[in-house]
């Protein structure tokens, strides 16, 4: 049962309640009371069967620093070690999933599970560990991995920078300093021509678009130019489609009848999303506290929309960072920690993709972090259903990459479990596909959702385990 339907009947229910009980109740309180009694998730057993378009591309995604291990020359590795010095309990990436040494096993498992595409990143810190010193040995490693993916019939999405960068580059100010674009150009000119024959889709950068502080606004402003320059360099060596992965969060005013919350809802959308879409379509870059810029080099520097989307963020205009508390009655506790992705909100798929009707769309990240794998199956059913609705409304959605193929290092902890495949860190990094991996495999084989597939893997709707201790 989705809230959009509930709200339509709320007025009738409220009128009936007040008439027959002769009690006057605040309408917003009434809504909250009712919604707390509603299931937090759709009854997925009521979803009708549906198919995806022919040649729809199915797969999964990872990021180098989160799965490879021993990324010792990166800024992330350095920051982890510095944090560990002051907090002995801090979890560092370490060996991560040991994907660097186990990529052949992982590729064969991808093939076994039916994946036809795989998104991975090139770790710049491995390729250029010191300024101006390039490692052909490390580049050869990525060439072997990409070649092995292609040999096994798996299309590749390659991200040139997925957050982590060489420590020396970070010390120079990374993407916050436009003067550093020459180092990025040099890196791309070294790597791209050597790997281009193995790449089907390119992501220049990953998720540089979020944040509202002045520092983040400056970072985003400059990153658009890094993206555009990367696009033009890659085009010199490859005719495959290019984009940058965009974190498309739906912003939602906490009080929808409050002019301040709704205004800041739209403001957050502009500074985190529309600024990029507008720049790609027109060449005009507009962000607060910066003079607008028109640069023809920016225009049309995406061949497709590469979209990472998970849920919504609540906006509260009365908070200095505009971050509102999520509604308690929509949270789904699936981990022994407070986690920002504790709400299922598939509406964000339909809402967000319908603003991207001018180019093909690939969802390059979407996933659920949970200990009870049944939640992941429900999540997939809900979000795939929303994708189907978006396609029916005219969105040219051509592919879906689940995040993540493996349980991995989530930047500061191993507690979140996004993976279709479990990794036993205490037992030689043994890989064990979860039931959701086989559910997803049958979705891929069927090129669509069916109740027959669902009922094979899900017997009942999962319930929140309130006994899970909060570790952090």
Model regions: which residues?
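Aromatic-lined carbohydrate-binding/catalytic grooves of carbohydrate-active enzymes
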Residues: 113-139, 161
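Aromatic- and Gly/Pro-rich amphipathic surface segment
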Residues: 77-109, 113
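Short hydrophobic alpha-helical segments enriched in small aliphatic residues
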Residues: 18-21
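Short, positively charged and aromatic/hydrophobic N-terminal segments
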Residues: 14, 25-32, 37
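Catalytic domains of carbohydrate-active enzymes, especially glycoside hydrolases
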Residues: 102-123, 300, 304
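Active-site region of glycoside hydrolase catalytic domains
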Residues: 38-87, 131, 140-381, 385-472
């Amino acid at each position: 049962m989705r809230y959009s339907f509930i709200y339509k009947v709320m007025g009738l229910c409220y009128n009936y309640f007040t008439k027959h009980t002769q009690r006057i109740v605040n309408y917003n309180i009434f809504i909250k009371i009712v919604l707390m009694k509603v299931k937090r998730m759709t009854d997925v057993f009521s979803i009708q069967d549906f198919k995806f378009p022919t040649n729809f591309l199915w797969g999964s995604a990872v990021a180098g620093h989160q799965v490879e291990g021993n990324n010792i020359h990166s800024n992330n590795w350095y920051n982890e070690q510095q944090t560990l010095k002051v907090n002995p309990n801090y979890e560092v990436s370490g060996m991560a999933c040991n994907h660097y040494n186990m990529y052949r096993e992982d590729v064969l498992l991808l093939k076994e599970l039916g994946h036809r595409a795989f998104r991975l990143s090139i770790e710049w810190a491995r390729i250029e560990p010191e300024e101006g010193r390039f490692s052909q040995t490390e580049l050869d490693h990525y060439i072997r991995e990409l070649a092995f993916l292609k040999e096994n019939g798996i299309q590749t999405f390659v991200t040139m920078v997925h957050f982590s960068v060489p420590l020396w580059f970070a010390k120079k100010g990374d993407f916050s300093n436009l003067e550093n674009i020459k180092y990025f150009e040099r890196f791309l000119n070294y790597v791209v021509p050597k790997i281009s024959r193995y790449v089907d889709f390119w992501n220049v950068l990953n998720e540089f678009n979020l944040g509202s502080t002045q520092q983040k606004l400056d970072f985003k402003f400059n990153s658009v130019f890094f993206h555009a320059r990367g696009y033009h360099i890659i085009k010199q060596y490859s005719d495959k489609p290019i984009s940058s992965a965009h974190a498309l969060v739906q912003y939602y005013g906490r009080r929808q009848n409050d002019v301040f919350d709704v205004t800041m809802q739209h403001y957050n959308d502009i500074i985190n999303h529309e600024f990029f879409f507008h720049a790609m379509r027109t060449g005009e870059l507009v962000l607060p506290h910066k003079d607008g810029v028109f640069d023809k080099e920016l225009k049309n520097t995406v061949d497709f929309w590469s979209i990472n989307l998970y849920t919504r963020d609540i906006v509260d205009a009365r908070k200095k960072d505009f971050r509102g508390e999520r509604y308690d009655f929509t949270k789904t506790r699936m981990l022994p920690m407070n986690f920002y992705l504790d709400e299922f909100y598939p509406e964000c798929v339909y809402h967000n993709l319908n603003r991207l009707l001018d180019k093909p769309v690939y969802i390059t990240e979407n996933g659920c972090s949970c200990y009870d794998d049944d939640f992941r199956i429900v999540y997939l059913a809900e979000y795939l259903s929303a994708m189907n609705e978006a396609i029916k409304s005219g969105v040219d959605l051509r592919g879906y990459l689940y995040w993540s193929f493996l349980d991995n290092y989530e930047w500061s902890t191993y507690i979140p479990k996004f993976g279709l495949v479990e990794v036993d860190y205490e037992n030689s990094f043994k890989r064990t596909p979860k039931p959701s991996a086989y559910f997803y495999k049958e979705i891929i084989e069927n090129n669509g959702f069916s109740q027959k597939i669902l009922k094979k893997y899900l017997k009942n709707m999962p319930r929140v385990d309130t006994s899970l201790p909060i570790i952090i």
